[in-house]
Amino acid sequence: MKQLIRIIIVLFAVVLAGCKKDPATQENAFDGPDYEKAAPMLKDGDVVLATNRNVEKFLTEVTYQDKNWSTTEIYNYYGGFNRVKYDENGVPSENGEVVKNPQSDRPESYSIRWKKNEEAGSLTLSLEEPTLKQEKALTAGTCYVDITNLVPNTNYTYKVTYDNSGEVAAEGSFSTTGHLHQVFFRSGCRNGRDLGGWKTLDGKMVKYHKIYRGGRMESGNVSKAGAAEIISEGIGAQLDLRGTSDVLSKPTVSGLDFCAPVIEQGGVAMLNDINEQGVNRTKQCFDFVLKSVREGKGVYYHCSLGRDRTGTLTVLLLGLLGVPEHDLSKEYEVTYFAPLGYSVSSSETSYYDKEKGGWLFHNDRTKWVYSEVAPYFWNLAGAGGTFAQGVEKYLTTVAGVPQADIDEFRNLMLE
């Protein structure tokens, strides 16, 4: 009898070992032609970087000082227009090439994969984080789905199910790391990022999925799929900061709340711009942002490049929330990683080097807009004042924003 029990135990162990999948074997099962265009594979239990790796390196390694705009480190980093020649590994090399088409404004992407079954019909992806659930329809025969625009330092769950049978094709969970929630909407809405995630001087954090900044959002660069991604992200409002020559008259995505104050330039001129009715245009922007956040609608604001006017408003909003000024200058310089038409305008021909065949980003923290706007708010703060107090003084005494609105904005945006 004891011998029989031993045999049964051994057989059970053999069967169990055969059923247990080796991770390498499991990954190899999802290689081949069907997956050759997929992003790197995401597996249950993985910890992955959400922020683009080049942007993450910059944000992690660089520390600036308040009230000192004489230096910048941005040109030391691969992934933007700096006219430095790099080899194929991103290492400076005289035999390399300058960056021709920066892509680091796009966040990291990963693929969820499953066994192909063309007979089972269409599928649905459900991707869930603590504050947002997204669903995406997938066509029959699909065997993977790429996911991107992930929020850093967040736990996710995912499930892919067949619509007809309810059978689960793939499911699991993963977590993310990183410093910045970047967003990219097809087919070419660039230079986008969430204002969430930044830490304040008093130890709080700006909430995610509330306010987004980016480059132009218009029909020419937002496809049908991109419009669906914008809605899925929780964005319900669009603020166009452009001037008379290119400002929109209605939202790019049907159903979005819309505001367009008509602003011709960024910097201090923008902060003191008054409309025909005698209303400060920056107050119009702040009022619309506050209304959107109050109503639970993510708001995406942009100019053309998402650099000067957009950068001015970002310094104001994050500065008001208490993000340190030295961190604001890092946030401002992230636009360096965006492509031509976003980090640099094609009309700025003086920044093109014909000999090297490369552009040069020039709107770093040492130059206009940032080196003009930051001192402006510091001067308003006065001796011993904080940057946030300077922004608050501007809003109450220059722009005409009620103190109650400022307090409400902080309460809604910080955790």
Language model features: what each stretch is:
Residues 10-11, 203:
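Residue-level detector of transmembrane insertion/anchoring sites
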Residues 15-18:
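C-terminal motif of bacterial Sec signal peptides marking the signal peptidase cleavage site
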Residues 20-299, 313-415:
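Cys-dependent protein tyrosine phosphatase-like superfamily
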Residues 302:
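Residues at the beta-strand->loop junction immediately N-terminal to the Walker
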Residues 305, 309-310:
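Ser/Thr-glycine-rich phosphate-binding loops at phosphate-binding pockets of nucleotides
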